[in-house]
Amino acid sequence: MATLKEKLIAPVADDETAVPNNKITVVGVGQVGMACAISILGKSLADELALVDVLEDKLKGEMMDLQHGSLFLQTPKIVADKDYSVTANSKIVVVTAGVRQQEGESRLNLVQRNVNVFKFIIPQIVKYSPDCTIIVVSNPVDILTYVTWKLSGLPKHRVIGSGCNLDSARFRYLMAEKLGIHPSSCHGWILGEHGDSSVAVWSGVNVAGVSLQELNPEMGTDNDSENWKEVHKMVVDSAYEVIKLKGYTNWAIGLSVADLIESMLKNLSRIHPVSTMVKGMYGIENEVFLSLPCILNARGLTSVINQKLKDDEVAQLRKSADTLWDIQKDLKDL
């Protein structure tokens, strides 16, 4: 007796299980992971979205909640499991998992605890998706991108840290607010280490090709009567402020990660400030990852833009590199 489905649908092609073309995996379904997931779904970037976490009930609940929104999305398959086989054939894997910093905990201790988590996660990702590109979002992102590169054995153009993509977006938003224009028309770059020691490249800030530093030569210095330097300070402080107010940050980083994925899956060759291996650049001698303007396309992170930096900016980059290396050199089991 034919089933209702058989009566309704007459097959034309053989029912072979198709390998997805644009599968994306998000590891970690906390606030950041789910913000990445919803941003990816909202931009219709994936034909399959996989979620992985160790908390099975939370994981299943998040999967079901997203699946129930399928009518309003263009992603036909949303799956989740604690077993990494669910991630097989991913084009891009976003890593948001990791342990949180405890009160009074040193960064080195936090990093070492996250290394121990990544030692389980990263080999599993590579086992099931050997051709993927990994985007690391977990903090401290520059060090954990290095850790991921070491543990994965992937070439450096396929291990990317979300880095200063969000810092630069915050910078452009805050400057654009002061000027009364849209952030996309206000160009400026935050480079280096994501977070406290990031570098604002004031010399490159422009609107419609007009250098703002030419209009105000003191811009970004302590002698600036308009105190533009405060904008960079606000960028650095903004995560702390949001965390103080709501407990975590998630929406902006989620949107920022989807932005990076779009450049890769659509082969756009757009330029983003993301964390990449900078050994040999700007006189940096160690294997550290810092944000520089990078071209992202279907092959991953294919090139780095040689930004003309001033001496003090280069000095700041090198200082960041030294700080990161001081922590990395003492990491165990890499």
Curated annotation (Swiss-Prot):
Modified residues (N-acetylalanine): 2
Superkingdom of the source species: Eukaryota
Pathway where it operates: Fermentation; pyruvate fermentation to lactate; (S)-lactate from pyruvate: step 1/1
Phosphoserine PTM sites in chain numbering: 44
Presence of the UniProt keyword Phosphoprotein in the record: yes
GO cellular component assignments: cytosol; membrane raft; mitochondrial inner membrane; mitochondrion; oxidoreductase complex
Parts forming coiled coils: none
The protein's name: L-lactate dehydrogenase B chain
Organism: Rattus norvegicus
Lineage, uppermost ranks: Eukaryota, Metazoa, Chordata, Craniata, Vertebrata
Primary gene name: Ldhb
